[in-house]
Amino acid sequence: MYSIVKEIIVDPYKRLKWGFIPVKRQVEDLPDDLNSTEIVTISNSIQSHETAENFITTTSEKDQLHFETSSYSEHKDNVNVTRSYEYRDEADRPWWRFFDEQEYRINEKERSHNKWYSWFKQGTSFKEKKLLIKLDVLLAFYSCIAYWVKYLDTVNINNAYVSGMKEDLGFQGNDLVHTQVMYTVGNIIFQLPFLIYLNKLPLNYVLPSLDLCWSLLTVGAAYVNSVPHLKAIRFFIGAFEAPSYLAYQYLFGSFYKHDEMVRRSAFYYLGQYIGILSAGGIQSAVYSSLNGVNGLEGWRWNFIIDAIVSVVVGLIGFYSLPGDPYNCYSIFLTDDEIRLARKRLKENQTGKSDFETKVFDIKLWKTIFSDWKIYILTLWNIFCWNDSNVSSGAYLLWLKSLKRYSIPKLNQLSMITPGLGMVYLMLTGIIADKLHSRWFAIIFTQVFNIIGNSILAAWDVAEGAKWFAFMLQCFGWAMAPVLYSWQNDICRRDAQTRAITLVTMNIMAQSSTAWISVLVWKTEEAPRYLKGFTFTACSAFCLSIWTFVVLYFYKRDERNNAKKNGIVLYNSKHGVEKPTSKDVETLSVSDEK
């Protein structure tokens, strides 16, 4: 019992400066850690002229795959590292292997360690499980709570609109959509600095500080007396929330491996649905119990309560967010756990964040803009940001148009779709991670998304069909954790490239919603929204098709790096014989140089 108290209370307190400020942890890699990456160790072993013993460990007659393990000993440092290679003959490779997303990413032996019913990969050590559990609490769980309050502050305007704000402030015509756009514009503009600084700043300081700032602005929204004042407040709320979405996605890519990331990102997205769900419940409770208290309408109290919750969560963030493995500020991770997190990055071939290199490197930018990633992924994300009708508030506006529900009942009914969305989200995350098929997870969600929006575009259907269609609306967003996690994996080899691509694709995609929403989601057309539902269905279809383009380029990159993933390729049909272990060793040394 004492050891537990010491690890979660006593030791963390000792790591605080002046008893309340988390500071950067100074943790040096041990010699064993520095030599634990397989290729470096193999290279050193060969250069030391140590002997190598090669032997067959696994043979799959079905696929004619061979595994060989080379064991190298370096007596100087007492390091013994084993690396397994799969020797794969690509002669007569069937066409359907194109759909095997992990064909060149992980070898068959590693695949055998993945069990769909287990949260951890088979063979994960106790220390690594402990680290992952800590990260799940400190990063994944906290990010969920942070996204929850962020979304409370984002969508509360829709609940306020149907709870009396429209009449109190004199909303007319398209004022609602214009107010929503002001938030988006502020959010986009203030993402631009993070194009350069996302991987250069201690995010454990930045994110909570911005949380506190937008909390104060949310209080201000409770006291506005005109639509222009509300628009100004929403602009600055969007500005202070600008980096949060990007930053959490970046942090997931800094700690988790490719087949762990989607579930954690999906857990983060749960905060979005909890925010939508609880916004209706909170507004319903507030309107019923606080409407008129101290002369304030119920919708104004809603903003105040949202702000109070945001302040509390922001303060917790200073102590919960861990930074990243090479710039770690966590008071809860031990030195050995920080080293283990770094080792996991090396195993996943993830480039480390570096606060010390120069901010603007023209060579790096040329490399980024001459590569496929920034263009293909940006267009992909534009389809993603426009493939849902949730943010339009169409469901709530349709319910209100029926003129049969009281305001508290409207807010209660608004909780149904995000509740279902949470189920869709976790199901999609499990499909992507545990079945090792992110493309299938995306297609799975978009089939239902297209069906729902097509029904709503038709509109002249039975009321039950409309209920069914609106119940499917959260399938549109369910694939977003998959997309962002996949982007992290695609760009994993260089941290700055990963950050720049992430910010660029997000800015461009979110920018598209700022003007598209004005064109297709005009408030005066509610709740019919013919253009909106039609455009959303088309975006979902384009997203599905473009996912296969991403899959093609992703697999091409992974094939070029197959050996680093433990897969040695050859084609006997073209007269290329199976390489020997010595050939692979020589190539490993060559690659390292």
Swiss-Prot record:
Main localization of the protein described in the UniProt heading: membrane
Keyword Transport on entry: yes
Cytoplasmic membrane side: 1-130, 197-200, 256-265, 324-363, 433-438, 488-499, 554-593
Transmembrane as UniProt keyword: yes
InterPro entries from the UniProt entry: MFS (IPR011701), MFS_trans_sf (IPR036259)
Extracellular face residues: 152-175, 222-234, 287-302, 385-411, 460-466, 521-532
GO molecular function, one term: transmembrane transporter activity
Keyword set, alphabetical order: Membrane, Transmembrane, Transmembrane helix, Transport
Transmembrane portions of the chain: 131-151, 176-196, 201-221, 235-255, 266-286, 303-323, 364-384, 412-432, 439-459, 467-487, 500-520, 533-553
Recorded GO CC terms: cell periphery; membrane
Localization terms from the record: Membrane
Protein family: Belongs to the major facilitator superfamily. Allantoate permease family.
UniProt function note: Not known; suppressor of sulfoxide ethionine resistance.
Protein name: Probable transporter SEO1
Gene (name only): SEO1
